[in-house]
Amino acid sequence: MAAHPPTRISIGFPGVVRNNRVLTAPHFGDEGWHDIPLAESLAKRLGGLPVRMINDAEVQGFAAIEGHGIEFVLTLGTGAGTALFRDGELMPHLELAHHPVSKNRAYDEYIGDAARMKAGNKRWNRRVEKIIGILASLVNYDKLWIGGGNAARLTFKLPANVAVVSNDAGIEGGARLWHPLSLRDTRQFPEATQRTGAFE
């Protein structure tokens, strides 16, 4: 760490993030987590290093996406995370985790980890398979990437345009977050306008 000190910081936050600010954080309890400039606060505490923060599913998506067409990310962990990309550009965040999906249960309550432990892995797999079909109709994605700690628990055959992402992908995604070619949405990060070549 001393030989290679950090120059930038990437944060994947489990909540709704916009312009480096936390809008809501349901898993932490919404009280006290409304419009919080978390990235700015961390930058000050970390010696002024530049900080970028987006939703954690979006960070994982940056590592997985191929940059063509509509790509959707579904993470299976404590809850259900989602991210949407179009031709490599991060689209506005869809917080489907708290949207009703079955018998007034939200995605979190239907395929989150608590639901998996209660329903059992076999039944939970059937639910995830159902969700894949729902997302295919809802988003009409070209590619669906499934990540998160519980992605390894999937036992059914995935459709040809669905793939599992390593749970460590967030590390690479955090690096890609700083590369101009991975940040076409310059409205979100205006400073990312200078192209420096292909990301490797």
Name what the model sees in each region.
Residues 64-68, 73-76, 136-138:
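Solvent-exposed alpha-helices and their adjacent loops that cap or buttress functional pockets
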Residues 1-5, 105-145, 149-200:
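Adenine-nucleotide phosphate-binding core of ATP-dependent small-molecule kinases
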Residues 77-80, 96-102, 167-173:
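Short, acidic/turn-prone active-site loops that include or flank metal/cofactor-
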Residues 75-79, 88, 149:
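A short acidic Gly-Thr/Ser loop motif
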Residues 38-60, 90-130:
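Glycine-rich phosphate-binding loop plus the immediately following alpha-helix
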Residues 15, 62, 80-86:
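Short beta-strand scaffold segments in enzyme catalytic cores
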Residues 2-10, 16-70, 110, 159-180:
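Glycine-rich phosphate-binding loop and adjoining helix at the ATP-binding site
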